[in-house]
């Protein structure tokens, strides 16, 4: 099996961190999103929506979407329990995964794709043309900054995002912070709990994927 990715993009980063934490080795194939390689026919045969990452199994089947890929490997190798162990933990981790995606990642994506010249006529991750809407960029920035305050409040009362144990929610938040910096949404002195949490996570093995 192999994973097609663009190493520095946020969704591939989530899978990289997850697999590093699980100590799972997989072959990676780089797809140059900047040059538009993901919109060429060869890659569209793998993922018609053009997004990365995409996991191609040995039988030829393809799993796209970063969280779906992580779920696949989690089913193969459950430990360490990054999606929670007990029913309660699983529910809480899933809740925070969704919150981070909806309240954090999505607004940053809206901001970037509706403001960057690189995404002109490509405001959504799809090979078909979609015009940018500048107002969505402004709203995305506002919502992402609001989320910094919300997650800082959460971390002021909890060691990790989902509670006492490191989980996929922490991976998602760590990637969110890197992605948010692309549009200048960065924690300030008002987000001390978030800043301290990030310092702790940066020492973990999975965070080292950002060094390559």
Labelled PLM ranges:
Residues 27, 163, 188, 209-210:
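A local structural micro-motif
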Residues 1-131:
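GST-like domain detector, emphasizing the conserved glutathione-binding G-site
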Residues 45, 203, 212:
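Phosphate-coordinating loops and pocket residues in cytosolic domains that bind phosphorylated ligands
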Residues 74, 78, 156, 202-203:
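Residues at helix-coil transition
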Residues 102-200:
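GST-like fold's C-terminal all-alpha helical module
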């Amino acid at each position: 099996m192999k994973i097609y990715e663009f190493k520095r993009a946020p969704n591939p980063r989530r899978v990289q961190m997850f697999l590093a934490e699980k100590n799972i080795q997989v072959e990676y194939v780089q797809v140059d999103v900047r040059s538009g390689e993901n919109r060429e026919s060869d890659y569209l045969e793998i993922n018609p929506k053009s997004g990365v990452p995409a996991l191609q199994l040995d039988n030829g089947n393809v799993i796209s979407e970063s969280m779906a890929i992580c779920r696949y490997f989690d089913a193969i190798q459950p430990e360490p329990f990054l999606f929670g162990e007990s029913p309660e933990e699983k529910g809480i981790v899933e809740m925070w995964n969704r919150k981070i995606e909806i309240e954090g990642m999505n607004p940053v994506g809206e901001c970037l794709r509706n403001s960057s010249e690189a995404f002109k006529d490509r405001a959504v991750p799809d090979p078909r043309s979609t015009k940018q809407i500048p107002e969505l960029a402004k709203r995305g920035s506002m919502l992402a900054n609001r989320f910094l305050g919300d997650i800082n409040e959460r971390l002021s009362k909890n060691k990790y995002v989902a509670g006492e144990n490191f989980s996929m929610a922490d991976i998602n938040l760590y990637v969110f912070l890197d992605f948010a910096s692309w549009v200048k949404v960065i924690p300030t002195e008002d987000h001390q709990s978030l800043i301290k949490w990030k310092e702790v996570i940066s020492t973990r093995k999975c965070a080292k994927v950002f060094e390559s």
